[in-house]
UniProtKB/Swiss-Prot annotation:
It comes from Bos taurus. Its main location: mitochondrion. GO terms for biological process: proton motive force-driven ATP synthesis; proton motive force-driven mitochondrial ATP synthesis. The modification N6-acetyllysine is found at residues 32, 48, 63, 72, 78, 85, 95, 117, 144, 149. It is found in: Mitochondrion; Mitochondrion inner membrane. GO terms for molecular function: proton-transporting ATP synthase activity, rotational mechanism. Belongs to the ATPase d subunit family. Keywords: Acetylation, CF(0), Hydrogen ion transport, Ion transport, Membrane, Mitochondrion, Mitochondrion inner membrane, Transport. The modification N6-succinyllysine is found at residues 78, 85, 95, 144, 149. Component of the ATP synthase complex composed at least of ATP5F1A/subunit alpha, ATP5F1B/subunit beta, ATP5MC1/subunit c (homooctomer), MT-ATP6/subunit a, MT-ATP8/subunit 8, ATP5ME/subunit e, ATP5MF/subunit f, ATP5MG/subunit g, ATP5MK/subunit k, ATP5MJ/subunit j, ATP5F1C/subunit gamma, ATP5F1D/subunit delta, ATP5F1E/subunit epsilon, ATP5PF/subunit F6, ATP5PB/subunit b, ATP5PD/subunit d, ATP5PO/subunit OSCP. GO terms for cellular component: mitochondrial inner membrane; mitochondrion; proton-transporting ATP synthase complex. This is ATP synthase peripheral stalk subunit d, mitochondrial. The keyword Secreted does not apply.
Length: 161
């Protein structure tokens, strides 16, 4: 049963190797070797444990009630399978991450379009050696001096100089 559950959750090591940074390759290789070791150990185990031959032990054990007592206790023993608390949480976080990645992707595409417009604007400006002050002020409005607000030279606030 454990082997079947593990078979469903295999790791794509090629994709995992592409994602991790170079300085983490040693840790990833160690993780991969541990995973292979544990997977091979689990593969050697049978799916169901072998049945206990209680008749053999009753015939060979000197104390008569001891084997019956062990058999009762063994049959009464129930090993609880721990409940999976974290898969739902991880799945929810994964969905949230997918949404945030999609949102970031759309924002990035809009930024790229804005930057391409700015780049096209920069490519189409007059060369600086042929520009006049008016051309410069038109292309870069932040260079224009405000003579109405600051009538005296240098026509800008002294704090910004």
């Amino acid at each position: 049963m454990a082997g079947r559950k593990l078979a469903l959750k295999t790791i794509d090591w090629v994709a995992f190797g592409e994602i991790i940074p170079r300085n983490q390759k040693a840790v990833a290789n160690s993780l991969k070797s541990w995973n292979e070791t544990l997977t091979s150990r689990l593969a050697t185990l049978p799916e169901k444990p072998p049945a206990i031959d209680w008749a053999y032990y009753k015939a060979n054990v000197a104390k008569a009630g001891l084997v019956d007592d062990f058999e009762k206790k063994f049959n009464a023993l129930k090993v609880p399978i721990p409940e999976d608390k974290y898969t739902a949480q991880v799945d929810a976080e994964e969905k949230e991450d997918v949404k945030s990645c999609a949102e970031f992707l759309t924002q990035s595409k809009t930024r790229i379009q804005e930057y391409e417009k700015e780049l096209e604007k920069m490519r189409n400006i007059i060369p600086f050696d042929q520009m006049t002050i008016e051309d410069l002020n038109e292309v870069f409005p932040e260079t224009k001096l405000d003579k109405k607000k600051y009538p005296y030279w240098p026509h800008r606030p002294i704090e910004t100089l």
